Amino acid sequence: MVNWVGKRMRRLGAIASMALTLAAVAPADAADALSRVLAMPKASLLVEEGGREAISRQPDRPMIPASTMKIVTALRAIQRWGLDHRFHTDFHLADDNWLWIKGLGDPYLVSEELDLVVATLKRQGLRSVAGVGTDDSLFAADVQIPGRSSSNNPYDAPVTALAVNFNTINVVRSREGVRSAEPQTPLTPLARQLAQPLASGTHRINLQERELAVRYAGELLAAKLSAAGIPVGGGLRTGRVPAGAARIYRHHGTRDLRAVIESMLEYSNNFIANDLFLLLGDDGDGQPLSTAKAQRAADAWARKTFGWRDHRIEDGAGLSPGNRLSARQLLDAVKAFAPYRELLPSQNGRVRAKTGTLSGVSTYAGFVQRNGGWEPFSLLINQPAPHALRLDVADELAGAPPGLR
């Protein structure tokens, strides 16, 4: 058994004992990242090898997990719906010939999906509509995601049951005017309006408010209908689908849950994570889905699945600084996620893990490849730290030279 990690940890006073030690000797400079983490007062680290704890540093201390919370959300979604699940959106035609789109929480309703919708409606015989109505009532009107700010950053986009293109608009502003930055996405009146004050360049605009997000969904659908030769007579309405309106089409997204989760984890998409978080709060009572309902569902799941107690899950993306998980709790989720390990982002082929970053928070959790197998780890740093430190720790655990990513 190799003793160098054990000696380092004894010198640092990080742990009293260790079940196993790292199996491969690493150069002294490669060990620096691990030593630094073990010396940090506000850092927790838990590594298993062969089903036993290999490194344990403050494993039961509640910490802010940041975006590693997305592993928990992904696991819950898979357990609830299965990897083959496809989200859907309903389309209704009212007696006054208004076409209504009812959002049911599909997080990946993008421009290309609307093209498929319009093509199907046209094939079914839709020739014109009096106007487009939008129904976003699945989510409560007062939904507020803890930790989400009102900034224009795309990761702060509002979470709505009816959302297109992740509630963002991609535009190019130049001296010639404004144009869409995406060939598949026509420029709508709202997009033009929001882009006017911007400096020259390409911009991803966060729609910021629920009303703007729902309006944009209606405008984009109307533009797609018109482009396909289906005239839209009136304007836009927002409300509930009128009683008696016939459902003429249910569109199932082309991406299954596997693809949705893989994208969420790779790009750390907060919109997708919190959309799933709200949907997971559906208890079948027919009431709008709220943040409070989603939080209660998450807490009940954590207690039933893992027996957690000293935890707090305020949102599904890890945006909230009020979230709390210990390294041991996060490792519980990581180990349960083992069958879906390849959905996690890859680091140099020897690490599959999810990062998390907030101000003064740097986290990393997933799997490192060691001795022909994949071993789980969770690292939670709740104090200022270099961005690359967590990656270097994972490299070190995997026996790879730091920085080769």
Regions found by a protein language model. Give the residues of each.
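Bacterial N-terminal signal peptides that target proteins for export
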Residues: 4-16
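N-terminal post-signal-peptidase region of extra-cytosolic proteins
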Residues: 58-59, 73, 112-119, 315, ...
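C-terminal soluble interaction/assembly domains
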Residues: 312-405
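Short beta-strand scaffold segments in enzyme catalytic cores
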Residues: 44-47, 89-93, 365
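A short glycine/serine-rich beta->alpha loop
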Residues: 57-63, 207, 317-320
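Conserved serine DD-peptidase/penicillin-binding transpeptidase domain
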Residues: 32-34, 63, 79-308, 400, ...
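Active/ligand-binding-proximal structured segments within catalytic/core domains
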Residues: 64-77
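Beta-lactamase-like hydrolase cores
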Residues: 19-20, 24-65, 81-86, 120-129, ...
